[in-house]
């Protein structure tokens, strides 16, 4: 994939001056960390990260040794198992004979756009409703590119069924759902790249809800305490933490094993392993300007820390909608808020870091509204494949063999 450097340069130019400054500082910190052998962790949310191609770009950065750990949501796990993005046909459910009472809002039923050959291959794995599938050609509707699997038949159902099978494998081996699923995922997904390169990819506890049965299977695959410890270990080992359009970051800013902004003092008290965000660099790529406002309030008047010290409500004092995690981010000396569209910020950041490290990237994301962004999304639809169940089972068998012979 050729990289459109001119477009990425325009993305940078369109950022406001303060975001340019913090983005440049973020690049510098990331490059410095990697050059001294440090690690970078990425904390992603759902929707925008998928649609802007960010999760696929992060997978590329994992493969090239730039990103060393990822936390994400169950919804992203679901979509990566389905191939990240899908083309689906959205049809009125009534014409297919479905009861509107059980249909999603809008009374719409979705079909995954698949060839007959692809369906025949899938039919070896699961029972398909051939009568329903035959109706997809003549049913009135329109095609749209959406997050893969999810609500479209048959791939949405297939992913939910796979989740139950993967959960069973996890019960046998004691590994997280994400690792086992990653064995069968495309290497151009975060799950697949993580499994291939021994890089942890884990769902945070606040983001376990999502992706239907996938979320439940992820949550049940290992105990909550173990999940929290694994994530704490990832963050402990990271010099740079990048938050990308993520709503819930309590795991980072209010975690049970983090001592600087979280509840880690009590874990330390009880002789459990802990870590500190004190010397780390925190970046956040986000559209929410309140994040920067909260940081300004803290820097200019120490208002946020003062409110905490006096036990006063931060929202009333700051006069802005105050999410819990804003508090720690705003007060952290090494925090860098980059305010803007992640579809613009990530390409600039990734390319600048890769150039500084002398690394050539084979994939690049772009803001989805641009022509390059549209082409990127089409490329993902055509090239990033759904989870390969046979490959996953084969790697599971090899893992069991290694454990048995150890």
Model feature map: region roles:
Residues 57-63, 218-221, 256-265:
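Short, solvent-exposed amphipathic alpha-helical segments in soluble enzyme
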Residues 1-24:
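N-terminal glycine-rich anion-binding loop in soluble enzyme alpha/beta folds
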Residues 94-207:
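Ligand-binding beta-strand-loop-alpha-helix segment within the catalytic cores
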Residues 200-239, 243:
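Active-site rim loops that border cofactor/substrate pockets in soluble metabolic enzymes
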Residues 5-8, 24-142, 340, 383, ...:
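Metabolite-binding pocket within alpha/beta catalytic cores that recognizes anionic/polar moieties
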Residues 45-55, 75-79, 180-184, 207-211, ...:
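Gly/Ser/Thr-rich loops at beta-strand to alpha-helix junctions
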Residues 25-41, 163-168, 194-196, 233-238:
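Glycine-rich phosphate/diphosphate-binding loops that line cofactor/substrate pockets in enzymes
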Residues 18-21, 228-240, 246-250, 254-406:
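C-terminal functional extensions of proteins
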């Amino acid at each position: 994939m050729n990289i459109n450097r001119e477009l990425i340069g325009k993305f940078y130019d369109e950022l406001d001056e303060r975001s340019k400054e913090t983005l440049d500082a973020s690049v510098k910190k990331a490059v410095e960390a990697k050059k001294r052998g440090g690690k970078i962790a990425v904390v992603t949310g759902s929707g925008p990260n998928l649609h802007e191609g960010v999760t696929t770009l992060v997978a590329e950065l994992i493969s090239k040794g730039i990103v060393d750990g990822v936390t994400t949501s169950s919804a992203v796990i679901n979509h990566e198992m389905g191939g990240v993005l899908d083309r689906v046909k959205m049809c009125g459910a009534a014409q297919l004979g479905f009861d509107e009472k059980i249909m999603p809002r809008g009374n719409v039923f979705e079909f995954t756009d698949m060839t007959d050959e692809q369906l025949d291959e899938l039919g070896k794995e699961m029972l398909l409703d051939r009568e329903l599938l035959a109706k997809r050609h003549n049913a009135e509707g329109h095609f749209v590119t959406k997050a893969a699997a999810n609500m479209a038949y048959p791939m949405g159902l297939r992913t939910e069924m796979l989740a139950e099978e993967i959960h069973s494998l996890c019960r046998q081996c004691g590994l997280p759902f994400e690792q086992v699923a990653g064995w069968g995922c495309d290497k151009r997904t975060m799950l697949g790249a993580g499994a291939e390169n021994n890089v942890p990819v884990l769902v945070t506890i606040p983001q376990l809800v999502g992706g239907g049965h996938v979320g439940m299977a992820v949550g049940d695959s290992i105990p909550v305490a173990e999940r929290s410890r694994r994530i704490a270990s990832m963050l402990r080992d990271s010099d740079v933490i990048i938050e990308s359009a993520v709503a819930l970051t309590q795991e980072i800013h209010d975690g049970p094993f983090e001592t600087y902004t979280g509840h880690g003092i009590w874990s330390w008290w009880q002789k459990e392993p802990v870590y500190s965000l004190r010397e780390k660099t925190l970046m956040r790529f986000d559209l929410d300007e309140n994040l920067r406002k909260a940081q300004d309030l803290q820097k200019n008047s120490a208002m946020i820390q003062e409110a905490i010290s006096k036990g006063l409500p931060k929202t009333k004092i700051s006069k802005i909608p105050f999410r819990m995690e804003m508090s720690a981010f705003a007060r952290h000396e090494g925090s860098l808020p980059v305010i803007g569209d992640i579809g613009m910020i990530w390409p600039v950041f990734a390319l600048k870091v890769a150039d500084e490290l002398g690394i050539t990237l084979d994939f690049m994301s772009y803001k989805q509204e641009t022509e390059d962004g549209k082409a990127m999304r089409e490329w993902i639809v055509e090239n990033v494949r759904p989870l390969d169940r046979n490959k996953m089972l084969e790697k599971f068998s090899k893992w069991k063999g290694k454990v048995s012979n150890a």
